[in-house]
């Protein structure tokens, strides 16, 4: 095969690739990887565990307005505004979404001393069958609030875990 035929073939392949790619949309940070909108949330106190022992707790319901920005499917961050009067950062790590906030006066000791809690929501998109579904707009996970070890004279972190669910409002 002559050099001119090889060169002509290479030019034809390059031209076809350029024409084929010219119609493709470039990947941008505007992809719908994040969580944005208004959501109804619920933490189910009927299935709460206090220090890994089931104990009925008050359930909580609220409405969250979430705004996130992403630079990739695994790197997003933003803000959650709750109608309960708080706001907190939201971000992704290893496929899970995290919302972390400090809860002042979370619990009170027998002597009336207030205990601050760290509330962490860990959520992921879930399909109708209960499995992870990245295209879903519904989320499930866990609502965990933990107090400091040694609070109220006990050498143990008080921790309350509740199932969590979130869907578009």
What positions do the PLM features span?
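Edge beta-strand at a domain terminus
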Residues: 140-169
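Tryptophan-anchored aromatic micro-motifs
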Residues: 31-55, 139-143, 166-168
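Flexible, membrane-facing loop/turn or short amphipathic-helix motifs
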Residues: 46-54, 107-114, 147-157
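Generic short beta-strand segments
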Residues: 40-48, 83-84, 100-107, 140-149
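Internal, hydrophobic beta-strand segments that form the core of beta-sheet-rich folds
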Residues: 117-150
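Predominantly extracellular/secreted and cell-surface proteins with exposed
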Residues: 57-126
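Extended lipid/amphipathic-ligand handling interfaces
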Residues: 66-67, 127-132, 165-169
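Secretory targeting and sorting signals
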Residues: 1-29
């Amino acid at each position: 095969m002559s050099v001119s035929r090889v060169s002509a073939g290479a030019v034809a392949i390059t031209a076809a690739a350029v024409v084929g790619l010219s119609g493709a949309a470039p990947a941008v940070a505007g992809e719908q990887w994040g969580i944005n909108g208004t959501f109804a949330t619920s933490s189910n106190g009927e299935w709460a565990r206090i220090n890994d022992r089931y104990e009925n707790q008050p359930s909580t319901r609220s409405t969250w307005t979430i705004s996130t920005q992403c630079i990739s499917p695994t790197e997003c961050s933003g803000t959650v505004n709750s109608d309960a009067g708080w706001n907190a950062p939201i971000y992704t790590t290893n496929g899970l979404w995290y919302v972390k906030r400090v809860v002042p006066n979370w619990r009170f000791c027998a002597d009336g001393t207030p205990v601050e809690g760290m509330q962490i929501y860990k959520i992921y998109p879930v399909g109708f069958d209960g499995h992870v579904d990245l295209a879903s707009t519904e989320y499930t996970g866990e609502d965990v609030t933990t107090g400091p070890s040694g609070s109220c004279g006990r050498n143990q972190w008080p921790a309350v875990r509740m199932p969590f669910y979130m869907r578009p409002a």
